[in-house]
Every structure is written in C-alpha cells, then in structure tokens.
C-alpha cells in the first residue's frame, strides 16, 4: 500500500466513523444528543470517578466547552453531578440509567467495528495491523 492509499484510507475512515456514529444516533431513540455529547458520555462511562477536568483532558477541549456539554446532558437526563463527601468542591460525573443505556449501545457499535476489522485475519496480520495502529496512536499522542 503506497502513501496515497494509506492517506486516503485514514481520511475516509476518520470521516466515515464520525458520520456513521452521527447517523446511528439520529436513527435511534437518542436523537437528542450530538456525537460530541456521545463522546462525553463515553468518557464518563469509562472512568468511575470522572470529573469535568478529567473529561476536558480526555476530549482535549476546554473546561468551558465540557461544562456546556455537561449542562445539556444533565438537562436531558443522561448524566448527574454528585459532590464529593470528602471535598465539596469536587464534582463527580455519573451516568444515569438513560446514559448507561446509550453508552452500552455506543460500545456495542465499536465492538462490532473491531470484530469486523479483525475477522479472518491471521495472527501475523493482526500483529502487523497492531504495529501500524500503535504508530498512529503514538503519532497522535505526541501531537497533544
């Protein structure tokens, strides 16, 4: 695969994943959230003691941007804010029942995508792909 093919595939993959996630949200009963809000839910679902600062760092957006998203998600019933008993200045974010449901559906989409990618690959092919993905991941991490 030459440079242009790799570049074209990467560009297409990044764009398609975002579009497909957005379309699948619009076609579900969760049409009231955006893909950016879904990614916020995803971060909260991954970290049991998520805070607004943690979400901001994970999504690489400002705290103001996260706060706006959190306000919307709380109003829509996807998350709740709970103050720490030890330090009342600390606010933890938790998914509500509705938030946990959409988070599970989103994880299911990603699981199906990964399974489809590796289906039929030999161990050596998986290893080579893993090396390429590790290089891509590290490149993106270094840009942060």
Segments predicted by a language model, with ranges:
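N-terminal leader segment of winged-helix/HTH proteins
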Residues: 1-31
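Terminal interaction helix/tail motif
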Residues: 6, 13, 108-144
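A specific heptad-register position in long alpha-helical coiled-coils used by two-component signaling proteins
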Residues: 11, 15-18, 71, 100, ...
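Regular, well-ordered alpha-helical segments
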Residues: 15, 19-22, 75, 119, ...
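N-terminal helix-turn-helix DNA-binding core of bacterial DNA-binding proteins
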Residues: 22-62
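Short, locally clustered residues in the helix-turn-helix/winged-helix DNA-binding domain
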Residues: 42-46, 107, 134
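Charged, amphipathic alpha-helical coiled-coil/dimerization segments
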Residues: 72-128
